[in-house]
Amino acid sequence: MSLWYIIVAFVFFSSMIIVRIIRKTKKNLPPGPPRLPIIGNLHQLGSKPHRSMFKLSETYGPLMSLKFGSVSTVVASTPETVKEVLKTFDVECCSRPNMTYPARVTYNLKDLCFSPYSKYWREVRKMTVVELYTAKRVQSFQHTRKEEVAALVDFIKQAASLEKPVNLNKKLMKLSGSVICRVAFGINLQGSKLENTYEEVIQGTVELVGSFAAADYFPVVGRIIDRITGLHSKCEKLFKAMDAFFDQSIKHHLEDEIIKDDIIDLLLKMERGETTLGEFQLTRDHTKGILANILNAGIDTSAQVMTWVMTYLISNPRVLKKAQAEVREVIKHKDDIIEEDIERLQYLKMVIKETFRINPLVPLLIPREASKDVKIGGYNIPKKTWIHVNIWAIHRNPNVWKDPEAFIPERFMDSQIDYKGLNFELLPFGSGRRICPGIGMGMALVHLTLINLLYRFDWKLPEGMKVADVDLEESYGLVCPKKIPLQLIPVLTQWT
């Protein structure tokens, strides 16, 4: 009798698989791995989905189908397929799915990063490009960046005189937070509602919005699962901390009679109708939603770029020596280091590009959603399909990059490849309509800080550590930080 049940079960499940294959063939969907009932391919993601998807793409191709619970997904993993998604069919593929926790922390999708493609999104995008992140505005905040970098240099000098290690993760996060608080919110990080929790709130939020939440994939029971796992309560805690900070910043602006020229001031003018946002009247939630993007993306991305650059430099002594020699030759004994000095530092620019390549800031771009049926790479992508762009896979692909696991800045020598979204071999900030609008603002701080760190100090590992001991593993989130903090000992030099 038991044998009979086994035969029936075998025939039943075999029939299901055959039917699925036939249906899939008729739909002409991209190939993909077999799925489990209910959960689909979620079990194959692991703790680092960008790496898992890259591994799967080596078997199933540059455009593959996955199923996450009830959500149909495709993953693009090569420059060719990604170019189709981000350029050829940018309009059809640039909307966003409604994701539970990003919606919560952006005041119901009133932001730029997570809101769907719409007239409102186009107006906010236009406002950020024309008003917030212009070259003129970036330049206007140079004095603030110089002051905060000078404060960091003073701290490192004290640590160097005592031969004490510096936690660069923490110090660079604080630097970035201090700059963003001043240029965007008009207040100092020290003394603000986020003074003691900014690191937890920023990194927690970035990790939260990059997570694969049950509520997004299981409409009926997902929210219950997230309450059991604690994801829901974590979201509420982070949201309340951010909201209190925004209230404090806005109150400060409303009570201060001194006219400011920062980002909150512009948004408050739009609330009052003094400046327009097309046909839309901004509410307080719109203001906070836009500020949420600036706070989280602005602080975390710049800090992580600088941390990863210093990580790869200390783990590659040859590269560190070459980069420092260039910086010291160009800067010489000039006290007034400026951001524009980066234009004469060709090797340092190569180091930054190589860091973007080997550790892209956002290894999986924020999911997109097809707004209509579209054909990509010869396959049909139905409307409402989620589209993941795996930047990690492109940057580590041996068919795209020679020796992709090695850190070799010289690969960019005499190369026109840049990171501004036009070269699909290197896309740390994305491309197309959804490209990060704050590249100029973030990179200005990155350049100024790295030049100072390399010019003024030598760096060595803590006692007992060797170069081989430097950990290069990333944690997973929307932005992938270094898993183990980078501790380095600064050394005073004649340039300090």
Curated annotation (Swiss-Prot):
Subcellular location: Membrane
Name the record gives this protein: Cytochrome P450 71B12
Name of the gene encoding the protein in the UniProt record: CYP71B12
InterPro entries reported for this sequence: Cyt_P450, Cyt_P450_CS, Cyt_P450_E_grp-I, Cyt_P450_sf
Matches recorded under CDD domains: CYP71-like (cd11072)
Family: Belongs to the cytochrome P450 family.
Cofactor: heme
Binding site for heme: C436
TM spans (from-to): 2-22
The organism of origin for this protein: Arabidopsis thaliana (Mouse-ear cress)
Keywords on record: Heme, Iron, Membrane, Metal-binding, Monooxygenase, Oxidoreductase, Transmembrane, Transmembrane helix
One Gene Ontology molecular-function label: iron ion binding
EC number per UniProt: 1.14.-.-
Gene3D superfamilies: Cytochrome P450
Gene Ontology CC entries for this record: membrane; plastid
Membrane topology: Single-pass membrane protein
Stored Pfam families: p450 (PF00067)
